[in-house]
């Protein structure tokens, strides 16, 4: 578990990656339920990005899905959303904030639209990254939904705070 915590610190990635075999990455991924994602990255499906970026992206997804239930289970009526957000994003935000927009848009096709929106709820400072046109274009391609339907979904969920210029343009 200590190793897992270290891996989630952005400064350890280059050192850890140089000394880690693909099989070890897969073992770690199994622990966090993201084996398929790691395997896809290692097999070169995202070949235009470096191994460092692959690992960073996969760790982000692992972090997101691993910690989310923990914090949801610990919620009570006295827990404020802002307290949850600051605790929830302590480690993961630094990973997301270091991602180039292009890289996040590629990896976002692994995430469901609700996961992407959950990232917005968890850390308002990440809104600009998640709200990028490229991220939602990837979702449009993956989900294969016509633009008007995506626009209706966005309009019916104003609390999410998503503005999607391509939808506004018609």
Curated annotation (Swiss-Prot):
Domain F-box: 93-139
Organism taxonomic ancestry: Eukaryota, Viridiplantae, Streptophyta, Embryophyta, Tracheophyta
Protein name: Putative F-box protein At5g39470
Provenance organism: Arabidopsis thaliana (Mouse-ear cress)
InterPro entries assigned: At5g39450-like, F-box-like_dom_sf, F-box_dom
Superkingdom of origin: Eukaryota
Entries under PANTHER family matching the protein: F-BOX PROTEIN FAMILY-LIKE, OS08G0105100 PROTEIN
């Amino acid at each position: 578990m200590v190793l897992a915590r270290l891996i989630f610190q952005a400064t350890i990635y280059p050192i850890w990656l140089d000394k880690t075999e693909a099989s070890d990455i897969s073992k770690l991924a199994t622990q966090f339920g993201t084996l398929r994602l790691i395997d896809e990255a290692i097999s070169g499906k995202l070949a235009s990005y470096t191994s460092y970026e692959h690992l960073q992206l996969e760790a982000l997804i692992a972090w997101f899905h691993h910690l989310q239930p923990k914090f949801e289970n610990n919620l009570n009526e006295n827990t404020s959303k802002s307290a949850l957000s600051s605790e929830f994003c302590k480690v993961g935000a630094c990973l997301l904030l270091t991602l180039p927009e292009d890289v996040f848009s590629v990896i976002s096709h692994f995430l469901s639209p609700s996961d992407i929106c959950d990232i917005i709820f968890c850390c308002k400072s990440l809104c600009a990254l998640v709200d990028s046109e490229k991220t939602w274009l990837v979702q449009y391609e993956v989900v294969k939904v016509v633009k008007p339907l995506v626009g209706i979904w966005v309009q019916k969920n104003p609390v999410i705070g998503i503005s999607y210029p391509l939808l506004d343009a018609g």
